Amino acid sequence: MTLTLAVFAGFFVATRNQPTAESAVPYHAHVAKTVNDLSVESSDWVVIDRPPVPPSAQQLLRPNALSARVLRNEKLGAQATFIVVQCRDTRDMAGHYPPNCYPAHGWKWQMQPEPSEQVTIKLNPASQQSSTLTVPYQLYRFRQPGFPKERQIKIYSFFAIPGRGLVPDIDSVRKAAEDYRVRPYGAAQIQVIVDGGVADEQGRTIFADLMQASGPLLMELSQDPLQVPTGNPIGVPQ
């Protein structure tokens, strides 16, 4: 009996300060505001459309924050769709990535997974003490039959997991979904979509440019909510 009580007491002490869905509410409110306030426009990029999110996607993902913007760069003669979606529970993101979602809407995956790549962006580029952030990503190529010709797109995709950083693969999201310490803070998926006719090098430039503009958001989405250096960490139970 004494041993049972000791085990129970130890479990209680170990878990009573663990994050929960309720304690993470302030964190998700902060993330939603950050996503909604994000400005990716630069001197060369302007928002030309904000397409609505299909109700089916809303129901499946149950997003806490979602932003979709179509941007145009006249200097490059390029256009891109920039999407950020963040869920409250990592498990809601575990099955949602391009090879699963796009074929359900008539897109055909053109090839097997390509090796993940990465770009490096500067944080606080105007500062003399500017640091850098590595953004890994996976490139997916899809085509959709149509008349008079088929459509082709390229998707630059990755995930942000609080406390675990930026990752290019769905397996990392699934592993995070198994961790009750990470699960209440959810996960985010970021996609940059360009026309399939855009050269790979130009597509990479477009992706890097938009990630540079999104640096503060990427840091917010990937830092550990339990390790915020000042004040009380967002979402930590008291």
Predicted stretch roles:
Residues V31-L61:
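Short extracytoplasmic
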Residues T2-L3, H28, L38, R183, ...:
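Active-site-proximal structural scaffolding
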Residues D224-Q238:
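Short, highly charged C-terminal tails/helix-capping segments
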Residues A65-L226:
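A cross-kingdom signal targeting lumenal/periplasmic-facing segments of multi-pass membrane
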Residues N17-T34:
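Alpha-helical transmembrane signal-anchor/signal-peptide segments
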Residues M1-A14:
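Hydrophobic membrane-insertion alpha-helices, especially the h-region
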